[in-house]
Amino acid sequence: VKLKGPAFPSSSKTIKQLIPASRLNPSIQYYIRAYVWDNSSGKYIYSDVSQIQLAAQPEPISLSWTEESYSELPSAVKVYKTTSTMEGRNFNAWYAIADPKEVDFRVIYPEAVGSKQTVATQATNAGDCYVLINGAIFGNYNIGAIITEGSMTQQWHGEIEGCYWATDNQLYNITRAMIGVDSNGNPGAYWVGVPSQNRFFYYSSPMTSVVGQAKYDSVSETYPYPCVEWDPYYAISCGPMLVYDGKIMVDHSKAGSHYMTNYECWDANGVYYGNPDRTALGVTEDGKIVLFVCDGRIDASKGAYLPELARIMKGLGCKYAMNLDGGGSTGMWVKGPGMVNYKDDSWRTVKSTCGFFAK
């Protein structure tokens, strides 16, 4: 298999080209070599062969969960809470789980009508919501694409801008993690690339952009990999992808001063590092959807590092999982009690949410 590589560096600088875990089977040894087209000889030049194998996967984190009883929820929606310790730290978290064939999974985007709203306001305004969590990371706009009722709701903002993200003041073409459901309630998880407005390509592996390393051309039907067919009815993109096909996609290994698995070029301090409040969205082996939040930055709960969040989601049975906006944006609303996680001041208004609704 020949994979098209990154742009050739303009200087003699050595760059790393990475192979994501999503493309590797941990039980298989692979033989790889780099290649480049040589114009003078009219043929490919190949490097020596290297042998690689996916490193052993981190163990899932299993916590003690208690089912919460809320009379206004249907039996198809379950909510669980843990008040425990993780890696020696206090840890409080909640997750809701449901089959999207029994209840609706939807994405709400109030910015489409020109406003930001709290999670609770979005849930209440919907009228038929059971559980709702905050959605995509945002600055002046949501980062990524949002699909509602089969159409792109917001303008695509996939660029990584040096003035906003820590990307050495260069533009990196990327793909974004996305999770959603089709019109029949079948969940899917992919990376989405959008070369231009209203042109979507979905992939089962990410473009492996790494700040200061490989830079890639814009996506196409065949680049960085052949795209896959997917027709989401409701979907939200954020990231990074935490778990894909059962494999944990994130760690804290570095290339220079940047994280090697930060393929989507997220801000390292604000997203990739630290242990703040976290929000995540997952899909289990049997097609259920998991909505997760944890408290952070308080004595009662010290939050989760990104690799820990991936291990937690895998421990909940997620075959696929994606990080959502965290920190002050983290919030879970449940019909009956309202907001269930901790907040020491007013709830932040957010630009998108996702959750479970009546069919």
Per-range role (PLM):
Residues V1-Q57:
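Short, surface-exposed linear motifs at loops/turns and structural transition points
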